[in-house]
Amino acid sequence: MVQYNANMDCPIAIVGMSCRFAGCGSPAALWNAVMAKKSMLTVPGADAELPIGQRNVFNGPYPTRIGQLDKLYSCVPSMQHFPRQVNAGENQDLYFATQLAFDALNDAEMHPNRVKKHWRGSVRFGYAPPFNASTVNWLQHTAFLDQTMDILRRFMPKAPEAKLEEVRSKLVESLPAPNASSFLLGSGFRFVSWIARECKFAGAATIMDAGNLSGGAAILDAVEDLRCGNADVALAGALTPPLSRAYLEGLSSEVQFSTNPELRSFEENPSGTIPGEGGAFFVLKRREDALRDHDRIYALIRSVAIGHSPDDDPSAIFTMATEQAGIPIRTIGLIEADGSGIAQMEARETDIIRRLWGEHKPGGPLVGVGSVKGNIGHTLKAAISAGIVKAALALKYRVLPPQLTPDAPLKSIACPESSAYLLTEARPWITGDSANPRRAAVMGFNFDPFNPEAETSRGGRSAVIVLEEEPEDRL
């Protein structure tokens, strides 16, 4: 085995990508939706558990639209050379995530089904839903079934025990049959170990939950694996599976949902966010290794910063990211913003930009701002991953991509004095600074409990990923 000397400053190349979000089965499809300024959000069907417009248990609005994966979620095992059928009580998220990993590796010309060797690679994955088909099925067979029978005995004290046992048997028959495999694959550590095994990655495989920052946390760990020499290739990704009513109801106690049909980031009077579904994976290598292997490079990761910004300096994490990358802040030409549609969070975001860029001066640098959430909704744990896909393609194609145009843009970003401008139309990404390549920053925020009285400049937990173009003379 070749010994690698740690280099904590080396650029990390994105050499493969995959994604599946509402109406977008690939990075190319997502890019097309972005460039067309098209919302892929869909209205919940007639079988939706909670009728549109009805209030939920927290007396909050239920979203009238949601980023539905629909058929893009159905990744059958035959697509993965899996030898048997999927049990109805198994965790379908596993096969969806495995297919995303396969798609990313195929994009990087690392076809897992065509090689026998194992790569010296790690898998870092953001995923932790409160419910999945496997865990719910086991609860139904155990605690829920016992509770149901106790309720029946309480309200029908004279019912013959034999009749009650017959009811119990019928209830069991109506449920998917449980098995040890489905139970174990419903747990996080077996979930990510499965992906590593199927993709022939022999290194560390971990699953994590950092809320909306999960995609960034997965990238952070993968980058450290490569820079420390613990891996020669890394798979990093995040997933938000189809959202259940139970999850949405719980989330509504903390998050302001929009009742508008579309999410248009950075509106003057936003009504809230729209939840989305989906996931993405990235294949990462050290740049020197990617060049040696003649890989296509979408973009370079220069730094990843995650942490809590204090109330008096909400821009601290952004500053940390640029300091780690060793670059001046004003050389960043694109901010793929959080743009959640939640007023306090967007105000905090624009306040960070104002603090760092200041007022515009003639001849001074400008930074374009936009968000992919208008296209696919707020994909929660996968939100940062979606932003990285968009920003990486923007760097590859040298285009400043648009977002959905707000009816009334937020004044703090739409005013002439601002050094930031909202990207409501696509623009060629022209730079006259030969000393600095094109750079983008992807921002993400965790939700704070909804508080209409919160201060604009309040701190919070956030993530910033700095991306850079691969030099033009190499392409």
Q: What do these predicted ranges mean?
A:
Residues 2-475:
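Condensing-enzyme catalytic core of the thiolase-fold
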